[in-house]
Amino acid sequence: MNQIDLKNKTAVVTGGAQGIGLAIAELLLNSGATVSLWDQDQKLVNETANRLSSKGKVDAVTVDVSDLDSVKNAVIQTKKFMDGIDILICNAGISGPNAKLWDYPPEDWQKIMNININGVFNCLRTVTPIMIENNYGRIVNVSSVAGKEGNPGASAYSASKAAVIAITKSLGKELADYNIAVNCITPAAAKTQIFNQMKEEHIQYMLGKIPRGRFLKVEEAASMVAWLCSEENSFTTGSVFDLSGGRSTY
C-alpha cells in the first residue's frame, strides 16, 4: 500500500477495536497520525490500543455512540490525550439479524438505527464544531453497498446505511466553506466479526453478488480511507466511494 502522510494529524476511529475500523486505525498510525480508538467493548479496545502502541501514539476510549452524552464524554477524554480532532472515522455499526421486513423484531430495528445512524449523527454533531473552529477536518463515514442497493433479509441494516450516505451528502455541503471534507465509503462485505451476526445463507448471497468473486480485504478499505483523510483529497466532499468489487458501479 502507498504511504499517506498524516504526520501531526489527530484522528478518532469509532468501532476501532476490530475489523475495518482496526485496519483503518493501524494505517493511520503507520501514516504518522495520533489515533484515539472509540469502542463500546472496553476490554477489546484497551487490548487493541496496547497492541498498536508500538506503531505510534494511540489511546482507547470506551463509548456508546448511540448515547449523545457518552459521545460528549468521549470527546472530553480524547482532548486530554491529543490536541483537537483533525480526522473522524464513523465506522461503528452492527448488522443485526436476518429476517423479512414483516417479521423483523422492532427492538432489533431500533437498536440498528440507534447505532448505525444515530451514532453517526451523535459523533458528527459533537466533533464538527471542533473542526469548524480549526477551519480544517476530514470526515469519512463507513456506509455499505447495502445502503445503495438494499439487501433482502437486511432491511434495517440497508436503511441505516442509506441514511449514512444521505447524511454525508448533506454535511459535505454544510461544511464545504470550512475546509472540511466529508465523504463516505460503501464497502462490500469483508470477513470480520460482523459475519457472526449473519446467517450463512446471507453471507453466500453477498459473495455471489461480487463480480470480483471474493470478499473485501479490510486493508483495501483502510487504503481508500487514508487517502480521503489526507491533504491530497483537497477538493472532493459529499461523495460516495465504492468498494464493492464491481457489484455497484454508480
Residue positions per predicted region:
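Active-site helix of classical SDR
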Residues: 124, 160, 168
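Short C-terminal tail/terminal secondary-structure segment
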Residues: 2-5, 95-98, 149, 237-250
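Canonical Rossmann dinucleotide-binding motif of NAD(H)/NADP(H)-dependent dehydrogenases/reductases
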Residues: 4-36
